[in-house]
Regions:
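Acidic, proline/glycine-rich low-complexity IDRs
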Residues: 3-18, 46-51, 57, 63-68, ...
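Amphipathic, interaction-prone secondary-structure segments
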Residues: 14-50
């Protein structure tokens, strides 16, 4: 799964996330019939006390959705994906420091709590 997410993030990072006034990136997750789907959106606003900021979509890169077949339960998937995304973001910070350096980054299920990872 990590390689699949790494490849997806590499493709997404080719869009100009850093040039759009985006202050926060949200990796959303929802369940599908065969597993889960990840997507990325960006917002020009962020509020640490109100997760509704993630609903303010000011940026959606092309190739935004990644379907992942999985038999994990939602908690296990969330924990695994959160760690993988954090690792991938840290790796991309080395190769493209401007990409995520000034961004809030969070992961969450569409109808659940959001976890800030950066």
């Amino acid at each position: 799964m990590k390689k699949q997410i790494e490849n997806w993030l590499q493709k997404l990072s080719q869009d100009n996330i850093d040039d759009n006034g985006i202050v926060a990136l949200y990796f959303g997750i929802y369940e599908t019939e065969t597993g889960f789907c990840l997507y990325l959106t960006g917002s020009k606003e962020y509020d640490a006390d109100d997760d509704d900021w993630a609903c303010s979509v000011d940026f959606e890169p092309q190739g935004n959705y990644l379907s992942i077949d999985s038999t994990m339960d939602w908690e296990q998937f969330f924990n695994t994906v959160s760690v993988i995304i954090e690792e991938c973001v840290n790796e991309l910070l080395i190769s493209r420091p401007k990409l995520f350096s000034n961004k809030i980054i969070a992961v969450g299920f569409d109808d659940g709590q959001i976890l800030r990872i950066k």
